[in-house]
Design a protein with these regions (language model features):
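ATP/nucleoside-binding phosphotransfer catalytic cores, i.e., glycine-rich phosphate-binding loops
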Residues: 15, 178, 184, 209, ...
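Short Gly/Thr/Asp-enriched flexible loops that form oxyanion-binding sites at enzyme active sites
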Residues: 68-81
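Gly/Ser/Thr-rich active-site loops/lids in small-molecule metabolic enzymes
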Residues: 149-157, 201, 206-227
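N-terminal glycine-rich "phosphate-gripper" loop used for MgATP/nucleotide binding
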Residues: 62-67
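Catalytic core of DAGKc-family lipid kinases
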Residues: 3, 29, 78-82, 88-188
Length: 288
């Protein structure tokens, strides 16, 4: 039996419409399933654990955005229970890395016909991440964008976030320790990635792989504020590695230290001074 964990608010209610499509298709195929709804942050993790403990579940399916997929993944870590993803959020970034379909019934077809395969999960201090973490200009823009979404919709919050991010930009001074080697610099962007995309499809780590047993570190050096508008479009188009002032490394462990930094962890912002990243190879089973 498949358990579908649905976040009703995902995609401004789009997840509920997808739920009806999934119910109809599962009924048409005469396949046993159950649907449960999340009602608070972290609830999807609890529901995933309950599905595993039930002893009757053969797979747990996330119906929501990247946040729902991440929470469900946390509940399935190292259990062998496979995760399926039916995208229903606004970003749906992780599915792009692993090549999953965006259309709901096509995603369901993958779940019903493909054998699960292992993917890596990132470790960060005492928590996990599935996709991308980082600090710098992009996180500043994300913070302003999230604030703008409280009073406007569509593309306007992103435009407001970008303009305010440029207006208030300051370089982030970061000390890195990468596989034992330490250096310091002022950065525009510092991203640690298991996946390739963030922010609704921006390829911040375009060469990352979710099943290579490594993390990708992309660092864009600090540039003066007046130059930022010239780099925004190439960044949005996924050309970050084309900049001569961008460095890219693959590694097993990364430590970054920057007092008072804001860290993006799979789309959520957390204040901290120090972050230690590791990779957990093949820790999650995924239909893909």
């Amino acid at each position: 039996m498949l358990t579908f964990i649905v976040t009703p608010a995902a995609g401004n209610g789009y997840a509920l419409k997808i739920e009806e499509q999934l119910k109809q298709e599962m009924s048409r195929r005469k396949l046993e399933c159950c649907f449960v709804h999340t009602d608070a942050p972290g609830h999807a993790t609890q529901l995933a654990k309950e599905a595993v403990d039930s002893g009757t579940c053969s797979g747990v399916i996330s119906v929501g955005g990247d946040g729902t997929a991440f929470e469900v993944a946390c509940g399935l870590m190292n259990t062998g229970m496979p995760l399926g993803i039916v995208p229903a959020g606004t970003g749906n970034d992780f599915i792009k890395t692993v090549g999953l379909p965006k259309k709901p019934l096509e995603a369901l077809e993958v779940i019903l016909t493909k054998q699960p395969r292992p993917v890596d999960v990132g470790g960060l201090n005492d928590r996990l991440f599935l996709n991308v973490c980082g600090t710098g200009f992009d996180v500043t823009v994300l913070g302003y964008t999230q604030a703008a979404k409280q009073y406007c919709r569509g593309l306007l919050p992103y435009l407001i976030g970008l303009i305010r991010g440029i207006a208030h930009y300051k370089p982030t001074h970061v000390r890195f320790t990468v596989d034992g080697h330490t250096e310091e610099r002022d950065v525009l962007i510092c991203s640690i990635a298991n996946g390739r995309f963030f922010g609704g499809g921006i390829a911040i780590c375009p060469e990352a792989s979710a099943d290579d047993g490594l993390l990708d570190l992309v660092v864009v050096e600090h540039k003066p504020r007046w130059q930022l508008p010239f780099y925004v479009l190439p960044l949005l188009m996924g050309r970050v590695l084309k900049f001569p002032f961008t460095s890219h490394k693959r590694c097993k462990s990364i430590e970054i230290f920057s007092p008072g930094m804001n860290l993006n962890i799979d789309g959520e912002i957390y204040p901290m001074d120090e972050a230690k990243f590791t990779v957990l190879p093949g820790a999650l089973s995924l239909f893909w």
